[in-house]
Amino acid sequence: MLRTTRRTLMQGASLVGAGLFAAGRGWALNRLEPIGDTLAEEYPYRDWEDLYRNEFTWDYVGKAAHCINCLGNCAFDIYVKDGIVIREEQLAKYPQISPDIPDANPRGCQKGAIHSTSMYEADRLRYPMKRVGARGEGKWQRISWDQATEEIADKIIDIYEKYGPGKLMTHTGSGNMSMMRMAAPYRFASLVGGVQLDIFTDVGDLNTGAHLAYGNALESFTSDAWFGADYIMFLLFNPVATRIPDAHFLWEAKWNGARVVSVAPDYNPSSIHSDLWMPIKQGADPFLAMSMVNVIIEGKLYNEAFMKEQTDLPILVRSDNGMLLREADLEEGGSDQVFYHWDSRTGAAVKVKGSMGSEEKTLVLGDVDPALEGSFEVGGIPVTTVFEKVRAEAAKYPPEETAAITGIGPGVVRAEAETFARAKKALLMTGFNIGRYSNGIYTSWALTLMLALTGHGGRTGGLDTSWIAWNQPALLELAFFDFKKLPRLEAGGLGEFVRGGMMEHSRQHYDNDKLKARTGFDLDELQEMIDESIDAGWMPYYGDMKGLISIADNKFRRNKNAEAYRERILEEVEELFVDINVRMDSTAQWADYLLPAAAHYEAWDLRSIAFHRFVNVFSRPVPPIGEAKSDWEIMEILTRKIQERAIARGITGYEDGDVTRDFATIHDDYTMDGTLMTDHDVVSWLVENGPEFAGATLEEGVERGFFVMGEDAGPTQKLRPSEPYHAFLQQTEGKEPYKTMTGRITFFVDHPRFVRLGATVPTARHHAGRDASNYPLNFFSPHTRWGIHSNWRSNKFMLRLQRGEPNIYISPQLAAAKGIADGAQVRVFNELSFFFAQAKFYPSLPPDTIMMEHGWEPHQFPNWRPMNVCMATLLQPLELVGGWGHLNFSLWHWNANQLAHESSVDIEPA
């Protein structure tokens, strides 16, 4: 029996007291007072339990959320005592928009609930620092803000003096997704003309197939719209792990009668709760989608009215050369963006309304009945329809033929396709991993075809891409300097691939012939197509840089071929490397200067996100730790120094194309002549000028903790106060054209590169994977539950909820064959490099695959060698095209993703 003596009790009490002080919680004992008249008042502490009771008292409560690249955006109450955040709690006061729909509460997850511990951890940056050793050596000197910004300002001016504009990268990563934190560095980049990569594609987050079909990848559904669906399918999406605050809508939909299907290579946390798990082979998703298209078309389960009005399926294609029939083919001086239907009623070709070249911007067909099938002749030119082309391609993928590729039986595919086609409201949901596969564009394009064939759009469902770009013009005007001057906007995946020298490592890893057989192109062809895209001006790439200001971007962790990439970038930015960051991450370790940024609870800010209509307020519950400053104030100080030094050196500005980079007035321009000096100034200005706030005041938002966005927040339609937001209602109900070349959902692209790669219509292609190289195991890295990218990955509480160190997931069968025990250290390797990790048994994973959740910092691995050292990568050449209707470079809409799941490895005991 356990016995407690006075001695052990006193020893334990001593340890508890020491622990409180060591944890910065000494204030819990500061309330002890001398005993006075014991009859007049109670003792301050009647018993030992009062120590714990007073631990949970506070001075005041502030408001905040967490503004890194997380789609939760959850309002929290922040409890402060003696100037220290002692804990946070979910606010859970969001209003219910309709009695028929569950509310959004409580919103939150384990990452947000421990941020008050993370902000005080040892990796937190507190003071400006200057490197005094070699890069990466870890030798730093604490300096003042004045010294840091003056030296940085002079080095920026030196770069412009020596090389002219265009050699300074001022890249803001996905760690800054709130309004103030985003506007500050983007406005700075706009003024200096810095290079800013697309933050979707540099990490592989862009759903290019959605843009290809709809002309807009950032039009989707709020999560409360999921509740009304009667059919939901997840692909490359694990919402229980990665959409924690919103997942309840999915299971409430299930309880409300919806069928929920999980398509995943592993029996993941979302598969567990689904009605059906379809255990697809990794990377085979486009083959599954095309086999379902096959069933829908062959069974005539399609909705002809929707197809005729909303899609390009009835548009005419020339049979002689395989190109769309254009007005320019039939009329001298005709447009190449006006197209034709075949009107079944009149037996003649009729010009399509709503295209980019049409003067009639409507989808209304009127008396025209477009033919979906058949062959015709127009002006002596033989033609057929897009639908005929699509049907011929889909015929190649019956479920019986694709079963060996997907691992899913034909009976299951047929039954599921029929159930999907009959659904009243169907949602196909993809996560951000779809952009990290070379065949992700094929997957998404085929999914949009499934939806269009069956009439699922607007209120009847559609493709959920996890993102809505709300109408927030004031934010964009602030960030992009009223669009008078812009940063050098660069294609994200392309920029990282070329600048990081990744082709060299791809050539080491892939077998060219095998790669061609898998993807439709080899590395020589890929290089040729990359060069063509840059030389033709389709995709902007600005070449080597001389300086880098990195803001909230852990680029040395996230990029593939990690160590070689880091060496290449450090060699390039020889003049200057500044890292503006909250913590000492794997990128900050290599900088010349470190500027400490305020954390989530230390600055005024606003945050909106796609899945809900609420803008959360950050009321700066505590001042920044040490000498950290808000992002706005950092750029205010830096522009002030640039202006001072430019004037002192007799420099006014630099001609840069059509604009002048006015260094002698850059601080005045940045602050609107002194109007916006602080983060609070910025937040006040945004609320006053943003139509999404519908006239509400900042004080009202602070009191509540959030704003409810008004009708004007809707990007393509009104955000109705009592209805969820559904994608493309303006098209399905308002009959406005889509932002595509034909004005319709697009399933035929006759761009020369699409023709070259045999992809003029939706089809299926393999990703590279193990069969494109010489290593036996597929290797993929989904998002983790225990962090947002690398944020919180090293937090002690998050580590306690898992193995506590980097681990790979391995099937017991593979482990047995390799002589690996659960929990053992393993060596993962290929010809590029190797890393060590712990093995964790995962029975649902196929024996030809290992999985590792992303986001681990290099310093958490033995020898600081991370998983990315073994990752070769590619670009998808279709995503690099331009000069075709809506397929032109567009920030956050159309350019090539950095890919993550294309390489292979082997494994052995360490």
Curated annotation (Swiss-Prot):
Residues holding [4Fe-4S] cluster: H66, C70, C74, C109
Catalytically driven reaction(s): 2 Fe(III)-[cytochrome c2] + dimethyl sulfide + H2O = 2 Fe(II)-[cytochrome c2] + dimethyl sulfoxide + 2 H(+)
GO molecular function: 4 iron, 4 sulfur cluster binding; metal ion binding; molybdopterin cofactor binding; oxidoreductase activity
Protein modification: Predicted to be exported by the Tat system. The position of the signal peptide cleavage has been experimentally proven.
Enzyme Commission (EC) number: 1.8.2.4
Signal peptide span: 1-28
UniProt keyword Signal, yes or no: yes
UniProt enzyme class: oxidoreductase
Keyword ATP-binding assigned: no
Compartment(s) of residence: Periplasm
Any GO CC annotation of this UniProt entry: periplasmic space
Domain of life: Bacteria
Major localization listed first in the record, in broad terms: periplasm
Gene3D superfamilies in UniProt: 3.40.50.12440, Dimethylsulfoxide Reductase, domain 2 (3.40.228.10)
Record note on quaternary structure: Heterotrimer of alpha, beta and gamma subunits.
UniProt xrefs under NCBIfam families: DMSO_red_II_alp
Protein name: Dimethylsulfide dehydrogenase subunit alpha
Organism: Rhodovulum sulfidophilum
Gene encoding the protein: ddhA
